[in-house]
């Protein structure tokens, strides 16, 4: 029984290795559809609840859907190059906070689910180094083109606090608007991927180079983000 199990494991390992060699041969093109998630944020991006008190709230990573495909050419045993096209929703979010409406009357605004959504078409050009047959390190250049307006939204609730510290919740409304953000975003993606039986797990960090907006007296924010995708290779 043990002998049969060992033989079966060796056969499976051999089949996996053969499939990897056949499905990603040198000198061939392949198409890799992908789907996954992007975790994005803007650097130097804050809101000030109270300028006098210096109450600063920095933005955080926000998750967004992404999907697309790469076309890869395996140039040598160790080098490949790919060009991709993806849809990705990027942006940022803030933790919930309160702003003062009237300190004398102890009236406040409670802000919840404050976030920005920016849709892009991303075009990454990647140079891939095959560290092993399955493990790949990569670096490249990527251009992102904004689709439509950059939007933000949050829920705003009127609050009133009594002298005992109790909070009374009043009207709630949804606030929406558009952001000033450049249409083109250039970044440098670096990452790794692992492939087994044509299934590819891919992780990248995109270093933002473009200043997203120019505000006098403030450091201009840049859009950097992580992407995590799963794909499948089809050799042409």
Where do the protein language model's features map onto the residues?
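N-terminal capping/interface segment
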Residues: 2-7, 70, 74-77, 205
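Hydrophobic core residues within well-ordered beta-strands of beta-rich domains
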Residues: 29, 65, 79, 121, ...
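Short N-terminal amphipathic alpha-helices
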Residues: 79-85
């Amino acid at each position: 029984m043990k002998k049969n199990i060992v033989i079966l494991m060796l056969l499976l390992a051999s089949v996996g290795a053969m499939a990897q060699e056949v499905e990603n041969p040198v000198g061939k093109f392949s198409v890799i559809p992908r789907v996954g998630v992007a975790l994005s944020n803007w650097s130097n991006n804050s809101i000030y609840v109270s300028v006098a008190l210096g109450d600063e709230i920095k933005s955080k990573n926000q998750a967004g859907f992404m999907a697309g495909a790469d076309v890869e050419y395996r140039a040598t045993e160790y080098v490949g190059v790919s060009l991709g096209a993806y849809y990705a929703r990027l942006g940022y979010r803030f933790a919930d906070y309160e702003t003062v409406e009237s300190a004398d009357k102890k009236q406040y605004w409670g802000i919840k689910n404050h976030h920005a959504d920016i849709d892009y078409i991303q075009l990454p050009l990647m140079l891939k180094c095959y560290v092993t047959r399955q493990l790949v390190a990569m670096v490249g250049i990527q251009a992102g083109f904004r689709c439509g307006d950059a939007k933000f939204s949050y829920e705003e609730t009127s609050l009133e606090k009594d002298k005992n510290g109790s909070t009374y919740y009043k009207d709630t409304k949804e606030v929406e608007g558009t952001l000033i953000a450049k249409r083109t975003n250039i970044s440098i993606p670096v990452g790794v991927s692992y492939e087994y039986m044509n299934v590819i797990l891919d992780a990248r960090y995109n270093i933002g180079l473009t200043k997203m907006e120019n505000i006098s007296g403030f450091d201009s924010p840049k859009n950097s983000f992580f992407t995590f995708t799963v794909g499948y290779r089809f050799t042409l």
